[in-house]
């Protein structure tokens, strides 16, 4: 798993430099026991997200600094609410979209789930961009209660699950 993490950290910027034929996102999800929250950071290529928004919502949407950032945040929040489903202890959770920042060739999105009490399991269903790119792969790095696990999600296997026994 450590090698996969290192590979992805190196590969993402390199792949971004060229016109990419690979479709993937990377999400880091960390449980904060003191704040009773799951903090997530998702990285998605600009052009892939833009294509999804243009096909799904409005052909004029641009995922860049020239587009109205409040509108862009609203589209990102709406899309993530539909495509990123978090369940804690078997119960679906409300996502709190915090915002995004622009990086070279990709968008970094910040999301949080709050009010997590007595954590026994976390399930993450991630279908980001799979409706536009069937070959899309979504990597999840999950860190909670001393456990670290990475998942590679695809169209046929789009759910990650981590259980904690007392």
Question: Language-model features: where?
Answer:
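Sec/Tat signal peptide C-region and signal peptidase I cleavage site
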Residues: 14-19
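Sec-dependent N-terminal signal peptides
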Residues: 4-13
């Amino acid at each position: 798993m450590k090698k996969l993490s290192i590979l992805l950290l190196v590969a993402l910027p390199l792949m971004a430099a060229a016109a990419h034929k690979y479709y993937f996102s990377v999400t880091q999800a960390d449980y904060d026991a003191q704040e009773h929250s799951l903090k997530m950071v998702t990285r998605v290529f600009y052009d892939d997200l833009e294509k999804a928004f243009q096909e799904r919502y409005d052909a004029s949407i641009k995922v860049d600094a020239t587009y109205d950032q409040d509108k862009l945040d609203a589209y990102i929040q709406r899309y993530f609410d539909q495509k990123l489903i978090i369940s804690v202890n078997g119960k679906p959770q409300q996502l709190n979209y915090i915002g995004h920042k622009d990086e070279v060739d990709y968008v970094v999105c910040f999301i949080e789930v709050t009010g997590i009490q007595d954590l026994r399991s976390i399930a993450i269903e991630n279908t980001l961009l799979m409706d536009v790119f069937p070959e899309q792969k979504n990597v999840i790095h999950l860190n909670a209660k001393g456990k670290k696990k990475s998942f590679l999600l695809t169209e046929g296997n789009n759910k990650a699950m981590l259980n904690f026994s007392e």
